[in-house]
Amino acid sequence: MNAQVSTTAPTAGSAQLTLRRLIIYALLFALVVIGAVGLSGLVERLLGTGVVVASNDVAGLARSLAFTLIGGPLAAVLWWVVWKRLDDPAERASAGWGLYLAGVYAVSLIVSVTALLGMAASFIGAREPRWSSPLSVGLAWAGIWIWHRWMWRHPVKHPAHLDDVPAVIGSVFGLLVGTVAAISALGGLLDVAIRGDTSLTPWVETWWQPVLRALVWAVGGSTVWWWHWFRGGGRKLRTALVDVALIGVGIFAAGITALAGAGVVVFVLLRMAFDRDGPMSELLGPLGPALAAAAVGSLVWRYHRVSGAHRSVATRRASQLVTSGVALAAAASGIGVIINATLAIAVSPLAGGGTRTLLLGGISSLAVGGPVWWQAWKPGRQPQTAETIPPGRRVYLIVFFGISAVVALIALLVIGFRIFEYLLGNVTGGSLLDRVRAPLGLLVAAGLVSAYHFALWRREHALLVAASPAQAHTIRQVTSRWWQPPTRTCCPRPSPAPPAPKSRYGEGPTRAPRRRRRKAFRHGNLSWSGGYLTHSPASQPRTSCW
């Protein structure tokens, strides 16, 4: 009874402590958000020029006052209690403290930066910019961000765990905002340079105003990324979260952007050469944004590829595999589209420009993704021994084999549905091949990818099996003290034991003498030595007894 109480009491106490921390930090998060919303509403009313504070929006003013005067003091009191508890190392090491800081840091950073950049961009080309509302929101949440950044960087009370989350959040957010805005600004500028000013209302908004607004967002996002990546020390962190963010955003997302932009550029050039249906201005419409996406995406991808080269071996291998996967997806999509368009031309040789455009799209996707995949994967230099197979390579092969197999299965089901629908129903218009050409192209592309990766996996699995040392069939089980070897069926039974001797102290028999334990023996393919029973195959069958 006492032992059970002593073992369950710490578990119950730990669960209650974790629940208490969770409730406290969740309540503090809610109160901080409530106080910031109320404060931003009051500041907006104070900054509004020519606006009465109460005006007609009594409910809005009452809400702002309640949030500020009730939620704000409660948040301050609860924060003071939490701050005093952080003198205990166990409180600083709890996951709740790190999650709270990361959550409020992310929300305050995103809201404040978005509001301030929106306010700055609203002054460009606007006759009456509405700056009071975004400025009040930006100031209130910027104060929350500065406060929590100070706690995150505190020399003593900073979180012991998840201390890299704010740097990662700031870097990823700034990189995404800066990249998207840079593509928009450069794309607008290139579009004007290629096609000229095509605005229908030039007297309302000139061509340079949206470019300049996008440039403001690009500069703001790049500043946030630089502050967290360089000044905040995110580049020097060697944690799994930083590696995942670097690969997921800097390699995967940037690679998709660069390949998509390059594919559209090749597609437009092919259409200019072989498919000039329609006005030239409409044909050149996607060229400017595509060039911008290819340029900015390639720049971001190249920087993170070089930055990942100074990290661990696993990070470098993962970045290479991710690049190969993105390029392979583009190339496989191109193969499927080419098969689809080829079947459409075979069904109707007099097909219009739509089929030709589809074929050019598939060729452009294959022309962009194929060389990048060949350079990243290097199919001519595959591992020849088990020692040269990277650990994550087999996971990559299994993932691509599984995904492509699922896609092929879905395409096969769609083909079967179209065939039975054509045979059983009164379907008019279009042949059977015309109905199944799209899923058939997808099936062929997915089948090729699945078969290739499965063949590689089988080959590398055989190399690993051949290189693994042969293991003896050993039964890891220690027998009892009085364990006896198996009964010998080919030998005569031993004679019965003699009667037990009489004890000299009484009429009863004495205790049987202790039987000596055999240290080793062998019986056929079984051998006993050192407390282990081992089975080893025999070269010749044994006919005699042991």
Task: Show the residue positions of the predicted features.
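Hydrophobic/aromatic interaction determinants used to assemble and anchor large protein complexes
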Residues: 1-411, 416-486, 490-500, 504-513, ...
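N-terminal beta-loop-helix "entrance" segment that forms/cooperates
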Residues: 512-520
